[in-house]
């Protein structure tokens, strides 16, 4: 399986994540995907061919293997990692939408050159407003997917340990036959390791949700105690009504200053311009 596309996607979202989110991504790729690709797939590569039963009845090996291993461990973990990583698409789409709106605002303001547009693409979007909700929802879905897959894994393989010998009496086996599992100890070690990594990811997801809620409450309390500063040039600042009003006031003040310069330079026409200025002020 090629994980390059998934890595590229999550790396892009990682730029806008919290510190806990970056740790989660490291656990996903170092302790889960790398182990799955490098070691686990080779360990489970012969699981079907090396599952041997002490009978020559055609089809007995296949039905016994399907009874005790309905879903391969590797395929189940691969599906789990894909679904756990999918909620990051929600954050990626939201960030792309915000950057698209900001680029449109820059073009309307006359700053649509490639340098400014590339700067918008590179700068980090702060987790606030609707992005905060999108990020929290994505983390909650990651948490739910992890918990559901661990429960499904427990239902399929109770105890999480790989047995050495299983007894099978499913048709078309002539009687109760003994079937032997290849590399049971090695598979048990990898199973425990992958489940432990999944448990660590669950803890990180819970910690990230708590951290985001606490930080949002702290920001709200700070805004209530101290009025928000109007300085800065972030995305929210560019689209806020205060920013737009400040820009309008700046343009009006520049026009007023230009009018005063004209009055100083042309005393003869100063009275007429002053009268027009007074009429405009009265309006």
Swiss-Prot record:
Q: Report the GO molecular function annotations.
A: gap junction channel activity
Q: How does it sit in the membrane?
A: Multi-pass membrane protein
Of the GO CC terms on this record, one is: connexin complex
GO process terms (BP): cell-cell signaling
Q: Which InterPro entries match?
A: Connexin, Connexin32, Connexin_CCC, Connexin_CS, Connexin_N, Connexin_N_sf
- Disulfide bond annotation, renumbered to this chain: none
Where is this chain primarily localised? membrane
Transmembrane ranges, per UniProt, are 23-45, 76-95, 131-153, 192-214
Record topology, Cytoplasmic segments: 1-22, 96-130, 215-283
* Pfam families, per database record: Connexin (PF00029)
Assigned keywords, A-Z: Cell junction, Cell membrane, Gap junction, Membrane, Phosphoprotein, Transmembrane, Transmembrane helix
* Signal peptide boundaries: none
What binding partners and quaternary form does the record give? Answer: A connexon is composed of a hexamer of connexins. Interacts with CNST.
The entry assigns this protein to a family as follows:
Belongs to the connexin family. Beta-type (group I) subfamily.
Function, as annotated: One gap junction consists of a cluster of closely packed pairs of transmembrane channels, the connexons, through which materials of low MW diffuse from one cell to a neighboring cell.
Name recorded for this polypeptide: Gap junction beta-1 protein
Organism, by scientific name, is: Macaca fascicularis (Crab-eating macaque)
Lineage, top ranks: Eukaryota, Metazoa, Chordata, Craniata, Vertebrata
- Gene this chain is encoded by: GJB1
